[in-house]
From Swiss-Prot:
The keyword Transferase applies. The keyword tRNA-binding does not apply. This is Bifunctional protein PyrR. It is an enzyme of class 2 (transferase). It comes from Dehalococcoides mccartyi (strain ATCC BAA-2266 / KCTC 15142 / 195) (Dehalococcoides ethenogenes (strain 195)). The gene is pyrR. Keywords: Glycosyltransferase, Transcription, Transcription regulation, Transferase. Its EC number is 2.4.2.9. CDD domains: PRTases_typeI (cd06223). GO terms for biological process: regulation of DNA-templated transcription. It catalyses: UMP + diphosphate = 5-phospho-alpha-D-ribose 1-diphosphate + uracil. Belongs to the purine/pyrimidine phosphoribosyltransferase family. PyrR subfamily.
Length: 182
């Protein structure tokens, strides 16, 4: 297997609709809810979740974007050179329920870095994590509150999420080590 499509565009649409319903159910359509997307692909996912919530409940949820690259624990690595993006959180997160959104949960290190960055913007009532894919292999004690799809994978495999906003189409692929980038 060089690459295999795990989810297509319609599957992703349905998955995000389900996650939006789960967020509403857990938080009782709370007006204290804000959604923040983690760069890169968490940003369009956050926007789509907010659009679904607006469509389902008529509730307009504030959406922000978070660049956590300077909070990563591999900054001293020779192979990692961060491209700084714009954090845009034009609202207070104090006493808010923050739903942090990412495309793939793997080791938990990006989530830890994002939470560290987020705390610099205020003191949320709670932070919940929504991910499109959970692939396992945690190195830190991090668990998602909302999971689109669990995709068990080996460490040698790569999960590639493509979204229309960033990649021109919606799909989730699993690639073996020899497949490289596509």
């Amino acid at each position: 297997m060089a690459q295999k499509v795990i989810l297509g565009a319609e599957d992703i649409r349905r998955t995000l609709a389900r996650i939006a319903h789960e967020i509403l159910e857990r938080n009782h359509s709370s007006r204290d809810l804000v959604i923040i997307g983690m760069y890169t692909r968490g940003v369009p996912l956050a926007n789509r979740l907010a659009e679904n919530i607006l469509r389902f409940e008529g509730l307009e949820i504030p959406v922000g974007t978070l660049d956590f690259s300077l909070y990563r624990d591999d900054l001293d690595s020779q192979r990692f050179h961060p491209t700084i993006k714009n954090t845009d959180i034009p609202f207070s997160i104090n006493n808010k329920i923050v739903v942090l959104v990412d495309d793939v949960l793997f080791t938990g290190r990006s989530t830890r870095a994002a939470m560290d960055a987020l705390i610099d913007y205020g003191r949320p009532k709670a932070i919940q994590l929504a991910v499109l894919v959970d692939r396992g292999h945690r190195e830190l004690p991090v668990r998602a509150d909302y999971i689109g799809k669990n995709i068990p994978s080996s460490r040698d495999e790569k999960i590639k999420v493509r979204l229309t906003e960033t990649d021109g189409r919606d799909e989730i692929l699993i690639l073996d080590n020899e497949a490289g980038e596509v």
